Design a protein with these regions (language model features):
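DUTPase catalytic domain/fold
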Residues: 1-401
Length: 401
């Protein structure tokens, strides 16, 4: 059994709360530990690992060879395998499999279940959880991880051993995918071990005051709204305040399909720009999809990971953000040892009724969590990152306007 260490960690070398160290600490596993899991066959792959598949605090998951259309979303439930549940729902489901090996279209409005190329064999103290990749969310593709015996989406319990599946439901655009396409990502959390220090209210406020989590010009509001380890964020509907400036996008109806391998689509064929006007507000229409951005410049320091929390009905009659993972180093200015200029991009869909969204309105929260150890790779510094230093930005499949 590991001895619990209660002696405070030194913070002198980082300016952060108790820098994450090597050892069996609780928290999110970094890239180095994920590679160790690969070497121990705790993560197994049907084809070789892609060179950029391991991210600072997660691993990308890849589509397998066949997609299976289903009439309804489902969870297998305790003791039931995903494939057995699919056969129970339709004993001929394999007859309708779509071959992805040369590429195929997933139609908007349909739901598909796809076996992934990765399977896992977790230790008893390690759990996992999934989120869509950033580009997946910005294309309005709903994805959810399903594991054998699962009673909830995107969650894999400690000690799980088995296959992984993804539910895919394109909402605004039909998309072309193929074997190996990456739509979601998996994080691993060590739940037991030598305890890493948890946040205190004073330490969290210090991070905010020093501009390490959010740009210092925005920290006052966040200090007033403090919840330890939680950062509220608001929507920007003004930009620089110039009349006619693009402050968001609305997905067009009846646009052509999108090949996820391409990077040269004209945004105006798929998106309607939303421009600033003096009212600084936007009415969200039911079942429309919007790309907006946060007012705050936010950051994730190297010893931390963050996740955007799921939709909360108390924030309004809309859902914000599919892709919840923010990696260590997102928005981080290493030279200044503080937050840089990266905004959070919001993927917004209204629900049953029109909803008036106003500039500066709180629309969600980021939850910060300690890494079990500092990653060897940081977002935007050591790896190629599509969205570092971003302001308002569409998915990587589109050219910049």
């Amino acid at each position: 059994m590991n001895e619990v260490i209660t002696k405070p960690d030194s913070t002198a070398n980082s300016g952060l709360i108790a820098p994450a160290r090597e050892g069996d600490y609780t928290g999110i596993l970094p890239s180095r530990k994920i590679k160790e899991m690969l070497n121990r066959n705790e993560i197994k792959m049907m084809i070789n690992l892609d060179h950029d598949q391991v991210q600072p605090a997660s691993i990308d998951l890849r589509l397998g060879d066949y997609a299976y259309p289903v009439d309804t979303s489902f969870l297998p439930g305790k003791g039931m395998k995903v494939l057995d549940k699919m056969e129970q729902l339709d004993d001929r489901f394999t007859d309708f499999g779509i071959d992805l090996r040369k590429g195929a279209v997933l139609e908007k409005g349909r739901v598909y279940v796809i076996p992934l190329l990765e399977s896992i064999s977790l230790r008893s103290e390690v759990a996992a959880f999934a989120n869509p990749k950033s580009s997946t969310g910005r294309l309005d593709i709903l994805t959810r991880l399903i594991a054998d015996g699962a009673t909830s989406f995107d969650q894999v319990g400690e000690g799980y051993k088995g296959e992984l599946f993804i539910e895919v439901a394109p909402r605004s655009f039909s998309v072309v995918v193929k074997t190996g396409t990456r739509l979601n990502q998996l994080r691993f959390r060590r739940t037991r071990g030598v305890e890493a220090r948890s946040f205190s209210a004073a330490e969290w406020k210090k991070l905010l005051d020093e501009g390490k989590i959010v740009d210092s010009s925005d920290h006052e509001k966040n200090a007033r709204s403090i919840k330890t380890g939680m950062l509220p964020f608001t929507v920007d509907l003004e930009g620089s305040g110039k009349e006619g400036e693009i402050i968001g996008y609305r997905a067009k109806k009846h646009a052509k399909r999108i090949d996820l391998e391409r990077r040269d689509y004209d945004p105006l064929n798929f998106w309607e720009p939303i421009r600033f006007h003096k009212t600084s507000s936007l009415i969200l229409d039911p079942d429309e999809f919007y790309i907006l951005m946060t007012k705050e410049a936010i950051a994730v320091p190297p010893d931390y990971a963050a996740e955007m929390l799921p939709y909360d009905t108390r924030a309004g009659e809309f859902r914000v953000h599919y892709a919840g993972f923010f990696d260590p180093g997102f928005g981080w200015n290493a030279k200044l040892n503080k937050a840089g200029s990266s905004r959070g991009v919001l993927e917004v869909r209204s629900h049953e009724v029109p909803f008036l969204l106003e500039h500066g309105q709180t629309v969600g929260w980021l939850r910060y969590e300690r890494m079990a150890a500092r990653p060897e790779l940081l977002y935007g510094q050591d790896i190629s990152s599509n969205y570092q230093g971003q302001s308002l930005k569409l998915a990587k499949q589109f050219k910049q306007l």
